[in-house]
């Protein structure tokens, strides 16, 4: 009788441990997406910035001449950042387009140090030369640091690199070797 009770307690504990681990993994959508395709890059489109494109008087150095995040976009970026920080995935490098909406998104994620990279800049309205952006991005993708790199960019750049169209705040895990993609969201 005692052996049956011990065995039953063991089996019940095993079920709860397995169930708990499954729930924890299901809630860590970032790690699940990266693991699903052995991704070495995660692209993220900047958080919500209402409108399309940028004003005609756009200048890279002046955020007042650009389409920027609104309060909903700021909240979205902060929520996504909280999910990333809760995740088991740690980024070896975090890069952002030089556009203000991408830099603000990256800052609001609340991650460690990050830097801008012109190979992530938008070529939607020809404020950046598409061929130059794609060439810089491809060189970077061919020479990544070990680990997983986060790249905060624009819909046109992410689509050019991965073939995936993304909404504001959406992410695409990308395996640079196999070219596999896995689109997901964290908000």
Q: Where are the language model's segments positioned?
A:
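Positively charged n-region of N-terminal signal peptides that target proteins for export
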Residues: 1-11
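Sec-dependent N-terminal signal peptides
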Residues: 10-20
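All-alpha RGS (Regulator of G-protein Signaling) helical domain and cognate RGS-like helical scaffolds
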Residues: 117-123, 127-134, 138-141
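Active-site-proximal alpha-helix that buttresses catalytic centers in soluble enzyme cores
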Residues: 27-126, 164-187
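Generic beta-sheet signal
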Residues: 39-42, 147-153
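Sec/Tat signal peptide C-region and signal peptidase I cleavage site
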Residues: 22-26
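Glycine-rich phosphate-binding loop signature in dinucleotide/nucleotide-binding domains
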Residues: 87-89, 143-147
């Amino acid at each position: 009788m005692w052996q049956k009770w011990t065995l039953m307690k063991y089996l019940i504990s095993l079920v709860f441990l397995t169930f708990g681990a499954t729930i924890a993994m299901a809630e860590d959508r970032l790690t699940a997406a990266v693991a699903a395709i052995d991704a070495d890059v995660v692209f993220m489109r900047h958080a919500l910035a209402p409108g399309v494109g940028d004003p005609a008087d756009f200048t890279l150095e002046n955020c007042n001449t650009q389409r920027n995040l609104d309060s909903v976009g700021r909240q979205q970026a902060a929520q996504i950042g909280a999910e990333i920080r809760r995740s088991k995935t740690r980024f070896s490098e975090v890069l952002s387009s030089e556009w203000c909406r991408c830099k603000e998104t990256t800052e609001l994620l609340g991650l460690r140090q990050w830097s801008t990279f012109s190979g992530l800049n938008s070529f939607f309205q020809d404020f950046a030369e598409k061929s130059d952006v794609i060439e810089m991005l491809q060189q970077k993708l061919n020479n990544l640091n070990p680990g997983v790199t986060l790249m905060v960019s624009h819909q046109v750049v992410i689509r050019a690199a991965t073939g995936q169209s993304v909404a504001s705040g959406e992410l695409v895990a990308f395996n640079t070797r196999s070219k596999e993609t896995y689109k997901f969201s964290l908000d």
